[in-house]
Amino acid sequence: MRLKDRVALVTGAGSGIGRAIALRFAQEGARVIVNDVKQETAQETVDAIASGSEATRGRAIAADVADSGQVKRMFAEVDRDFGALDILVNNAGIAEGAPGDREKIRARSEARMGELMGGGPVTTHWDLTQEMSDEAWHRMIGVHLNGTFFCTREALSLMARKNRGAIINMSSVAALMGLEAAPHYSAAKGGILAFTRAVSREVASRGIRVNAICPGYIDTPMTRPMSPVSQRLIIARTPLGRWGEPEEIAATAAFLASDDASYFTGQWLSPNGGLFIG
């Protein structure tokens, strides 16, 4: 077991990729702290960990990573009850910045696809940036980028005690290629990549490694509401011809958290089925 007895905190682990990472880390022997914005969903992941192994137990802590006060309280609890932190996965994220975003994008996506399939012209424009509210922009940046910063800041204080640790930031293929239907999401994920590079240089002398994962389209509760038309288009654009599974991202995270990746820092790995090749 590559992570035996290490203390790992995974944010946004109530479902999807985060839950898969928490389960994989537990299988690898880690003591897993499961964070989610809702206590009940975090506890569901902890219960899943317990059902898989009597020797490994998880711990649920609810906190909104976009709130620095809640993040500070979460890490104080980690320090009090575990006394150390070896691994942090900044995974918490959202798909829409404001109510109605998803429906707007879905409607325009279907309209544009219908126009394309009909031979054009395409008269439905995205127009998302010019219509975006301050609320939508700040919420998206707040959860993804601010949350990554808040959690990393607190984690470094714990990891610096032993001059050892691994931080994994969840970026996205959107940071590499840009998504026309999600300018705020693309910006947040791009910021996470730049933050990863900078912090990796800053803390390398302490033996702390910082890397990122840039998943392609993964089958999770956050992506399933996409329109059938959009889902088919994504598969058509992906050379491997399918969506990824959360467990495939979890395997990547387990590698980066382990000593197998001891010479990796400031890097990004992108399991995306060939959607982006670069």
What are these regions (language model features)?
Residues 94, 105-149, 168, 192:
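Catalytic Tyr-X3-Lys loop
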Residues 2-33, 199:
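Canonical Rossmann dinucleotide-binding motif of NAD(H)/NADP(H)-dependent dehydrogenases/reductases
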Residues 157, 201-202, 262:
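Alpha-helical segment proximal to the catalytic Tyr-Lys
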